[in-house]
């Protein structure tokens, strides 16, 4: 027997099995092929640079002497302070979420107030005002979809139409905690209500916690492909936690701002938000605004049923003097269509804006544009330009990650067909 021939055959068979196993491994399970510095259209961080973009960095305070925010898991009490559900159901204290929020705020307690919500569909807006104490709202269903909060609101409707839609039967009245929020919007004299007043769920509460809920702007595909900002969830508070929540809509689905009680963006306030184990769906600028937001183990899905054109996941309006905007880690990006959607664009609300976002250690599917994953800026139309820097003789990338001459949209260690650098 020819031993060497048998050995060669065994080796060939083993090598073939290895190649077959590798080729059958799904792209999202293969190691990342992203290498720094990337390209001007798709800049990639080095391992050393990526160390600057972690939860701890994003949750640092504006005051350099203040400790960073270190959120722990949401802990729920055995007995909530309020229960929302059908009249007559056991333990129910309120039949509407807004009534429970009003009751929690009027307690004037510095202690966190817990509002449990029984499974069901709750049509209408929810406004959570600024207050000394924080609010936790959570669904009692087995899944997030068991509790649905929703309404169809379009930024393009006039204030009169909006007022009748949002405030049936005097839901918001003078003397009630959230009146100032409603009143600020109803007094608008513009032709349309605008994005700032288009949210179904709007909170200005510091320390807000949301868990096991579905929040949706149901405007959906009932409008054309034009500008129809329709916010499902808007948050203006600091130290906000969102866990196991479905946030559904189309344009500007999830809107984060640093606005105060006057409902205008501020230049001296930082809001921080942690989103975990959640699902966000939309088409144009589905996650937008000004604030430091970390998304961990979250699914982002871009749909094209309304626009039939390019969609954008992120639209950060980060101030140029702040280093951190949006961070997505251990997450999944899925888009309908073939290579049409884009990961994001800067929302240039003024000349002092340069949106910042990092997507790292995540999976991006084939629905995203590999040649141009980042789009030109909204409003200003500033062309996207990534900073590739220079490479020294030790193969270290040298560049200023906050250079105002470039965009601040980065990736690191992503996988999947859509993560390919071309």
Task: Tell where the protein language model's regions lie, with residue ranges.
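C-terminal motif of bacterial Sec signal peptides marking the signal peptidase cleavage site
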Residues: 18-21
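Sequence-level preference for short, compositionally simple segments enriched
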Residues: 30-422
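Bacterial signal peptide processing site
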Residues: 23-25
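Intrinsically disordered, low-complexity serine/proline/glycine/threonine-rich regulatory regions
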Residues: 12-14
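Bacterial N-terminal signal peptides that target proteins for export
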Residues: 2-10
């Amino acid at each position: 027997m020819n031993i060497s021939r048998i050995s060669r055959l065994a080796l060939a068979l083993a090598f073939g099995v290895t190649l077959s196993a590798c080729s059958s491994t799904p792209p999202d399970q293969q190691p990342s092929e992203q290498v720094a510095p990337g390209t001007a259209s798709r800049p990639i961080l080095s391992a050393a640079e990526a160390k600057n973009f972690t939860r701890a960095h994003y949750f640092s305070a504006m005051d350099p002497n203040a400790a960073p925010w270190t959120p722990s898991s949401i802990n729920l009490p055995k007995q909530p302070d309020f229960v929302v559900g059908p009249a007559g159901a056991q333990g129910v204290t309120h039949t509407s979420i807004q009534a429970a929020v009003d009751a929690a705020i009027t307690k004037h307690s510095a202690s966190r107030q817990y509002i449990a919500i029984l499974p069901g569909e709750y049509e209408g807006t929810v406004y959570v005002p600024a207050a000394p104490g924080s609010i936790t709202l959570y669904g009692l269903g087995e899944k997030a979809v068991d509790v649905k909060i929703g309404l169809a609101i379009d930024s393009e409707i006039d204030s009169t139409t909006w007022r009748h839609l949002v405030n049936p039967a005097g839901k918001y009245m003078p003397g009630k905690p959230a009146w100032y929020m409603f009143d600020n919007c109803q007094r608008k004299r513009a032709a349309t209500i605008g994005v700032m007043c288009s949210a179904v769920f709007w909170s200005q509460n510091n320390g807000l916690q949301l868990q096991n809920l579905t929040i949706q702007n149901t405007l959906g595909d009932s409008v054309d492909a034009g500008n129809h900002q329709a916010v499902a969830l808007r948050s203006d508070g600091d130290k906000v936690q969102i866990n196991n929540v479905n946030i559904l809509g189309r344009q500007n689905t999830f809107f984060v701002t640093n606005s105060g009680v006057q409902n205008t963006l501020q230049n001296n306030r930082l809001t921080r938000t942690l989103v975990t184990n959640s699902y966000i769906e939309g088409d144009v600028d589905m996650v937008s605004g000004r604030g430091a937001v970390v998304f961990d183990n979250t699914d982002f899905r871009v749909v094209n049923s309304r626009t039939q054109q390019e969609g954008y996941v992120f639209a950060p309006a980060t101030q140029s003097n702040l280093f951190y905007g949006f961070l997505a880690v251990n997450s999944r990006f899925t888009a309908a269509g073939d290579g049409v959607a884009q990961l994001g664009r800067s929302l240039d609300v003024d000349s002092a804006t340069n949106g910042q976002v990092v997507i790292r250690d995540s999976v991006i599917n084939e629905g995203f544009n590999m040649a141009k994953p980042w789009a030109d800026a909204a409003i200003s139309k500033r062309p996207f330009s990534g900073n590739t820097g220079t490479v020294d003789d030790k193969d270290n990338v040298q560049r200023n990650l906050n250079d105002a001459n470039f965009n601040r949209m980065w990736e690191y260690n992503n996988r999947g067909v859509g993560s390919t650098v071309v």
